[in-house]
A protein has these predicted regions:
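A conserved amphipathic terminal alpha-helix motif
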Residues: 115-156
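Short strand-connecting beta-turns/loops that link adjacent beta-strands
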Residues: 12, 41, 70-71, 98-101
């Protein structure tokens, strides 16, 4: 299953990169995330509650950020299991300044596999569900960026 697209986030490239790789921001913005604990630099243990087409469960696994080239890109690897199934995926995140540099274009390209009960749902339902989760994540991250900018502006006054 492939997921790709791009989104524009509020903030300069370095600030967006820092937020997208901040464990607390990731924990807050991953839908259903109950745990996102760093176990080694760039590697996190996760617990998420999720569901697609009536199949609900708890996902436990790891998320690894690698190949970091701040502030341009990094690779995100996800591996985990849930209710007799598994999820594996790799995604590339690329960032580029947009316009006057006050916004950043984030491009993502990922490929994932699911097995077990969730695989029976099929691509027809998985693709839109994945896109919805990605959109929720980036809306939340844009909110994080705006909050951080507001806090920074208040601290500077």
């Amino acid at each position: 299953m492939k997921v790709d697209g791009n989104v524009t986030l509020s903030g300069p490239q370095q600030a967006v990169y820092d937020t997208l790789s901040d464990p607390e921001a990731l924990r807050q913005c991953l839908p259903g995330c109950e745990k996102f604990d760093e176990v080694s630099p760039g590697r996190y243990e996760t617990v998420l509650k999720a569901g697609v087409a009536g199949i609900k469960g708890t996902f436990t696994g790891t998320v690894t950020l690698s190949d970091a080239k701040s502030p341009e890109s990094y690779t995100l690897t996800v591996e985990g299991s849930f209710s007799g199934g598994f999820v594996k995926g790799v995604g590339n995140i690329s960032l580029a300044p947009e316009g006057d540099g006050s916004k950043t274009k984030v491009s993502y390209l990922g490929d994932g596999q699911v097995g077990g009960p969730l695989a029976s749902v099929g691509q027809r339902l998985m693709a839109p569900a994945s896109k919805m989760v990605v959109n929720q994540f980036f809306r939340c991250m844009d909110g994080q960026m705006k909050s951080r900018q507001s806090a920074g502006a208040q601290a500077g006054s």
